[in-house]
Amino acid sequence: VFCADLSRSIRCCKMHGGVPTEGFTEQFIISTVDAALYAQNVVIAAESAGLGICYIGAVRNDPAQVTALLNLPKNVYPVFGLCLGYPDQNPEPKPRLPISVILKENSYDSSEEDAQIKDYDEVVRTYYAMRSGNPKSQSWSEQMTGLLGKESRPHMRDYLSQQGFEMK
């Protein structure tokens, strides 16, 4: 489980007689990005060693239980889990969103994206239809509509506040 951790920095601040500030949005962003960057480096190393990986966002379904289980102090929260292992099969890799849709140079220009996303939707539909397990019929953009078209983990705001991430 990869955690955003401000408790260490707070202890360092106190160690030097400082008065730590808590709850600022920037601190939340920095600690979350740090956890994600660390995890991504673990993933790169694992995949280079032939391991398969799967990020597990479900640790945020009940973060209080995860916090208790892992004995996390205030100013620490679980961002996601990560499963590592040697695959017992060789599944076809899921096609990724084209880099031309993700990468922006010098300014944000999405004028060509709709056509590229529609093309990607067809690639994803074909992938889901052809894969051996858990076939789906939804396109990628339909999945995004499902994710953004509903409230997701509304308990996180209160949980984060209780952990010291108040978003000032």
Give the ranges of each region predicted by the language model.
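Acidic, surface-exposed loops and disordered segments
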Residues: V1-K168
